[in-house]
Amino acid sequence: KHAWTEFNSVRKNWAYRVDQMTSTHPIAVEMEDLDAVRTNFDGISYAKGASVLQQLVAHVGRDNFIAGLRKYFAKHAYKNTELSDLITELEAACGKDLTAWVNTWLRTAGVNTLRPVIKLDGDKYASVSVKQEVPPLPVGSKELRPHRLYVGLFDVKGDALVRRESIEVDIAGELTEIKELAGKNAADLLLINDHDQTYAKLRFDDRSVETMKKYLGQLDDSLARGL
C-alpha cells in the first residue's frame, strides 16, 4: 500500500540529493569503459531513472506504455537493444514524437522547481499558474521540461486534512495557467504533483504552508504527506 511513499522518501530523495551536486549527469550517458560505469551508475541512473520512467508512463498513457513494451519485448527477444528501439515502439503505440521528451528528460541533467502562482478573488481562485524554474546545476542550464502531473486541492474538515479533488494537467515552459481552477473555492492546501507522477522540487503558497504547520499530521494519504 505504501510502496510509492517509501520510493519517494528513500529512493527519490536520493536522486534529488545527487542531482543537485556538481557531479550531476544525465540519465542516459555513453558508457565507454568500466570506469564510466562505476562513475555514472548512482542515484541518478537508478532513482531518477525510475522517477522519470514513471513520468514517461504518464506522458504516453499507461495502456500505450504497456502496449509499446509488449511489442518491444516481442520484437527484440534474445537480442541486444538500444534506447531508440524502446522509444520507437512507444511512439508507435501512443502516436507521439518523443524526440524532444527524450532529449530534455534523459540527455540533460538537473532538477526543476515548480511553484504555484495564485491570485485570489475573495475566497475563490481568480487564477492559478505553475511557475517552472531551471535547474541551478549544472550551471547555465536552460531546461524547462514538460510535466504531466496532478494538482491536488485539500481542505481542513474538522481535525482532518482531506483531498477535495485532484486535476491532471500538462505543464510546459516557464509559466502554465491551470484554467480548470479559476473560480473554484481556494483550498487550504494546494499540492503540485499530487500522486507524485513527475520529478521536480516543489514549493508552496503561504496559505498552504500555514495549513501544513497545523494539519500535516492529519493528512491520511501517506504519499501526499511525504510530498
Regions found by a protein language model. Name each.
Residues 33, 82, 173, 205, ...:
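Alpha-helix initiation/capping motif
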Residues 50, 150-152, 212-215:
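Short, surface-exposed linear patches
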